[in-house]
């Protein structure tokens, strides 16, 4: 197997402000793995939060790509990955996820089967995805919500964590008025103290918010579990639910966990998490970070397994260089093309390697 890299810049349609940062663009590193005339693709994106800049991603992906030479094919490399034998233990989960995605794309193309079929799901998953509204004025949030509802979005996620919590309340109130039938999710990205969260959550419940992600700062899962026990609306762990061990500690103690493939290490890591929470009362949310359709595609093939799908990262881009998972009408769809089912924009189905 032979690997190659390409780094591109992904611009957002408009800056996305959350409680800890504002983002207008990020770099994506595309990994291609070629074997016997077939090529698989995966994507890793930069993240200041996880300490991953483009140079580090390029170095780590190049090292993983060079190491592929010891495997006879993608199937054996995937077996080693699933067994935890490869890549090395200190490889960041985002890098492991990108390598796994390229291998799964390659394996699926070699088998002539889409990823969801390789994972045992016969029907191509289709799911209503949340669409994110960042920290912005109530008027702008309302205009965005109105447009999203008109486009078919049934689920809207509102970012919170303003310096004045009343601004968050007013933003959610404006979104609720503009999209009265929408299901609302709230995400402060850990901005509140337990006391502030305890005071605010009943108010958001009164506005019909369906669930809140990571209301308090990560690092104290006991406090998060205690808040969930008394919260009037479901609490979903995100930054406190990174690894399988994190999730096991929280299973049955929070209402949901947000699994992002770049955070946990990829498709098979996500499946292990889903298995760990089964029957515990803790439900699965599939989330993402802002990326292209190539980066989102592996999660879309898992979307039928989740209570909540928040797979809109590609929809935040001014130009998505890949296509194949939908989402513009509020629903993401896994395709029936072999592998991940995506292709570079402007390339026909017949030309996909």
What are these regions (language model features)?
Residues 58, 62-65, 96, 100, ...:
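Predominant activation on well-ordered alpha-helical scaffold segments within soluble catalytic domains
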Residues 208, 219-226, 230-234, 241-331:
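Shared catalytic-loop signature of beta/alpha-barrel
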Residues 5, 33-35, 39-110:
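Metal- or metallocofactor-binding catalytic centers and their adjacent structured scaffolds
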Residues 1-12, 23, 36, 289-353:
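Flexible C-terminal active-site loop/helix
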Residues 31, 37, 99, 112, ...:
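Conserved, mostly hydrophobic/aromatic
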Residues 15-20:
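Short, P/G- and charge-enriched loop/turn segments at secondary-structure junctions
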Residues 40-42, 127-133, 154-158, 184-188, ...:
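Hydrophobic faces of well-ordered beta-strands that scaffold small-molecule active sites
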Residues 117-231:
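Metal-dependent enolase-superfamily TIM-barrel catalytic cores that perform enediolate-based chemistry
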């Amino acid at each position: 197997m032979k690997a190659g890299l390409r780094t591109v810049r992904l611009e957002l349609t408009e800056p996305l402000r959350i409680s800890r940062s504002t983002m207008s663009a990020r770099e994506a590193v595309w990994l291609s793995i070629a074997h016997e005339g077939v090529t698989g693709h995966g994507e890793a994106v930069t993240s200041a939060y996880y300490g991953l800049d483009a140079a580090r991603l390029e170095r780590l992906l190049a090292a993983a790509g060079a190491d592929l030479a010891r495997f006879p094919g993608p199937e054996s490399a995937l077996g080693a990955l699933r067994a935890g034998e490869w890549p090395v233990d200190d490889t960041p989960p985002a890098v492991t996820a990108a390598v796994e995605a390229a291998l799964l794309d390659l394996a699926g193309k070699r088998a002539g089967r889409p990823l969801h079929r390789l994972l045992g799901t016969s029907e191509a998953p289709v799911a209503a995805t949340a669409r994110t509204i960042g920290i912005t004025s109530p008027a702008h949030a309302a205009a965005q919500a109105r447009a999203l509802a008109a486009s078919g979005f049934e689920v809207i996620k509102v970012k919170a964590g303003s310096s004045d919590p009343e601004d968050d309340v007013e933003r959610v109130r404006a979104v609720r008025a503009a999209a009265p039938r929408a299901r609302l999710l709230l995400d402060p990205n850990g901005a509140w103290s337990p006391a502030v969260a305890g005071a605010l959550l009943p108010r958001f419940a009164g506005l019909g918010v369906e669930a809140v992600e990571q209301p308090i700062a990560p690092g104290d899962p006991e406090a998060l579990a205690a808040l969930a026990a008394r919260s009037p609306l479901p609490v979903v762990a995100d930054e406190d639910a990174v690894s399988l061990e994190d999730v096991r500690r929280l299973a049955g103690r929070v209402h949901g966990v947000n699994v992002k493939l770049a955070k946990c290490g990829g498709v098979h890591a996500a499946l292990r998490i889903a298995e760990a929470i089964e029957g515990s009362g803790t439900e699965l949310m599939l989330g993402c970070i802002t990326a292209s359709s190539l980066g989102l595609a592996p999660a879309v093939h898992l979307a039928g397994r989740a209570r909540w799908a928040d797979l809109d990262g590609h929809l935040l881009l001014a130009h998505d260089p890949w296509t194949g998972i939908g989402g513009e009408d509020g629903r993401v769809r896994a395709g029936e093309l072999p592998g991940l089912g995506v292709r570079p924009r402007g390339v026909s189905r017949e030309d996909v390697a």
